Amino acid sequence: MKILICEDNQLAAKAMSVVIEREGYDPVTVGDGNKAIEALQKTDFDLAIVDIHMPYHSGLEVVRFLRTELKKQTPVLIVSAFSDPQIQRQAGEMKVSGYITKPFDPADLLRKIRVAVAVV
């Protein structure tokens, strides 16, 4: 399973990538919203994990592009250092599969990945 990780914090991106790779998944990591959009245009991912605050385009802007411009219903998990109810509401309106608060628990991340891809 190919998973896009869109995270500008290199330490968090590496941590997620290691956890995901250990489960046998294929992570692809990008560090900003522009690169996330480019990757989504070029590759059909099974899941995208998108940080809410990134350079160039926010996580919600990336999800909006995925849904409206690319017309894809790829499962998405939003990642944030803050548990913001407004962002969670907006993410829910865009049919986001889940919300992960940093620092993340590896077991919780894997559980949310399994739930997100099982829905498809």
Regions found by a protein language model. Give the residues of each.
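The feature encodes the CheY-like receiver
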Residues: 55, 84, 102
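Two-component/phosphorelay signaling modules centered on CheY-like receiver
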Residues: 10-28, 94
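Active-site beta3 strand of CheY-like receiver
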Residues: 43-49
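Acidic catalytic/metal-coordinating carboxylates
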Residues: 32, 58-62
